[in-house]
């Protein structure tokens, strides 16, 4: 009977050791899940950032060309006249907006202009 008790206690000890290893394994996998989720969030952030950088780089060529054109015009003007020459102002025009959005922006700008002029009148009185 003592041998069977010893065998049973040995099996119980093995099961407890296995249980402890499984608990440790579960803790490690939970930590791994948290780290992978964190990496996933960081990758999403990086993805948004790379999209912004790609957009900037896609427009960079046209920006450099615009600056170059303005500089060339300035050089030609300075060669023709002895007056002090200033570069031509560069204006950004949105091409991808719908007419409705343009009208909304114009109305908002007009309202802001009216408010600004009213504030000026009040301050002068």
From Swiss-Prot:
| Cellular component GO terms, alphabetical | cytoplasm; DASH complex; kinetochore; microtubule; mitotic spindle midzone; mitotic spindle pole body; nucleus; spindle midzone
Recite the UniProt keywords alphabetically.
Cell cycle, Cell division, Centromere, Chromosome, Chromosome partition, Cytoplasm, Cytoskeleton, Kinetochore, Microtubule, Mitosis, Nucleus
- GO BP annotation list: attachment of spindle microtubules to kinetochore; cell division; filamentous growth; G2/M transition of mitotic cell cycle; mitotic sister chromatid biorientation; mitotic spindle organization; protein transport along microtubule to mitotic spindle pole body
* Localization of this protein: Nucleus; Cytoplasm, Cytoskeleton, Spindle; Chromosome, Centromere, Kinetochore
User: Superkingdom of this entry's organism?
Assistant: Eukaryota
Q: Main location per UniProt? A: nucleus
Any idea what a deletion of this gene does?
A: Cell cycle arrest in mitosis either with unseparated DNA or with unequally segregated chromosomes. Abnormal spindle morphology. Inviable.
* Comp. bias intervals (Acidic residues): 101-125
Q: Where is this region: Disordered?
A: 79-125
Pfam families with a match to the protein in the record? DASH_Dad2 (PF08654)
Q: How does it assemble?
A: Component of the DASH complex consisting of ASK1, DAD1, DAD2, DAD3, DAD4, DAM1, DUO1, HSK3, SPC19 and SPC34, with a stoichiometry of one copy of each subunit per complex. Multiple DASH complexes oligomerize to form a ring that encircles spindle microtubules and organizes the rod-like NDC80 complexes of the outer kinetochore. DASH complex oligomerization strengthens microtubule attachments. On cytoplasmic microtubules, DASH complexes appear to form patches instead of rings.
The record's comment on protein family reads:
Belongs to the DASH complex DAD2 family.
Summary of the function given for this chain in its UniProt record: Component of the DASH complex that connects microtubules with kinetochores and couples microtubule depolymerisation to chromosome movement; it is involved in retrieving kinetochores to the spindle poles before their re-orientation on the spindle in early mitosis and allows microtubule depolymerization to pull chromosomes apart and resist detachment during anaphase.
Query: This chain belongs to which protein, by name?
Result: DASH complex subunit DAD2
**UniProt organism field:** Candida albicans (strain SC5314 / ATCC MYA-2876)
